[in-house]
């Protein structure tokens, strides 16, 4: 249903935009975001965040309950997700006939190809590895919330680049994120670690690498499209990681639990999540789409507690609230720096 909706919307949008004269496009864009599209887009992105949260729970299930090796799970996930995103990219491009000339140009542009490889290694591979290690040493909810500290890091980098001082609201958001990290890591007791030191280490590295994941591919994403770049980046990172991990040397039981776990991790988290998000984003303004996507850590915490029975203390929840609230504040303020 999601695939059909996206194809129908993209085809219809392309046909309509081709029929509108240039002098009328500015006025017609004001009426682009109708109430019906707003509701549909909002629900689609919220469904995407639930898919991402369920994907994290599936990863935790594979690592904790089924005790599968983290590097092997990551190799399978990266290669499978890369193939799925490449297939979705080809499907959407074929239906809309957009960027047809861009598809092969990245292989002929040495600079773009190097950026893609750098992005695959230091953006995707490092982010995913540290994220899954954070899940291994803690849980999906905590790992996801710590990963979203990347929003704070990206904001600070943007302030330095634009030579802009943060406003009082933005400063409060940064302080809230720091306070949230303190509460999660110490339980509110200085000198005491409430979570594994490795979980905190990998969570912070994940936030840093996720900032790289967001900032590095900006130009090539604008040129080739998000699914084109991320799909190929995931496939490259999965292949390179497999050369070191050699997943074929491990014996992975093909039980129904393992298969269902990987289906949740790959099909729900990647295929369904990506489809719902891009469909919703096509119906909403960029700011609203980005703000709604920040419900990802909320869904991760809720699903981890409901599906896997993970318990969180009041201090944990307070820390989650501080970080997630900071992310929403900065998302709402981001237009000032963009």
Question: What does each model-identified segment do?
Answer:
Residues 84, 89, 150-175, 298-318:
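C-terminal transmembrane-helix exit sites in multi-pass transporters
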């Amino acid at each position: 249903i999601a695939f059909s909706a996206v194809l129908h919307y993209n085809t219809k949008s392309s046909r309509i935009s081709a029929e509108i004269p240039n002098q009328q496009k500015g006025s017609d864009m004001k009426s682009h975001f109708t109430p019906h599209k707003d509701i549909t887009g909002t629900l689609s992105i919220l469904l995407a965040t639930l898919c991402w949260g369920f994907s994290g729970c599936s990863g935790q299930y594979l690592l904790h309950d089924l005790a599968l090796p983290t590097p092997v799970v990551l190799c399978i996930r990266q290669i499978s997700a890369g193939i799925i995103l490449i297939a979705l990219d080809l499907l959407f491009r074929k239906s809309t006939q957009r960027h047809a000339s861009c598809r092969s140009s990245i292989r002929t542009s040495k600079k773009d190809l190097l950026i893609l490889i750098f992005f695959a290694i230091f953006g995707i591979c490092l982010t995913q590895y540290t994220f899954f290690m954070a899940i291994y040493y803690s849980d999906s909810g905590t790992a996801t919330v710590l990963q979203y500290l990347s929003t704070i890091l990206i904001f600070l980098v943007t302030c330095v680049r634009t030579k802009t001082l943060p406003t009082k609201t933005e400063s409060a958001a940064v302080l809230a994120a720091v306070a949230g990290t303190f509460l999660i890591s110490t339980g509110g007791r200085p000198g005491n670690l409430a979570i594994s030191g490795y979980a905190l280490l990998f969570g912070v590295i994940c936030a840093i690498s996720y900032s790289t994941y967001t900032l590095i591919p900006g130009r090539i994403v604008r040129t080739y499209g998000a699914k084109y770049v991320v799909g190929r980046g995931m496939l490259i990172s999965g292949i390179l990681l497999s050369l070191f991990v050699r997943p074929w040397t491990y014996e992975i039981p093909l039980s129904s639990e393992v298969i269902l776990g990987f289906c949740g991790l790959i099909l729900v988290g990647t295929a369904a999540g990506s489809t719902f998000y891009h469909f919703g984003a096509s119906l909403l303004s960029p700011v609203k789409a980005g703000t709604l996507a920040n419900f990802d850590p909320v869904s991760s915490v809720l699903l981890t507690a409901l599906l896997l029975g993970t318990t969180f203390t009041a201090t944990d929840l307070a820390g989650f609230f501080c970080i997630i609230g900071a992310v929403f504040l900065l998302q709402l303020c981001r237009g000032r720096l963009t």
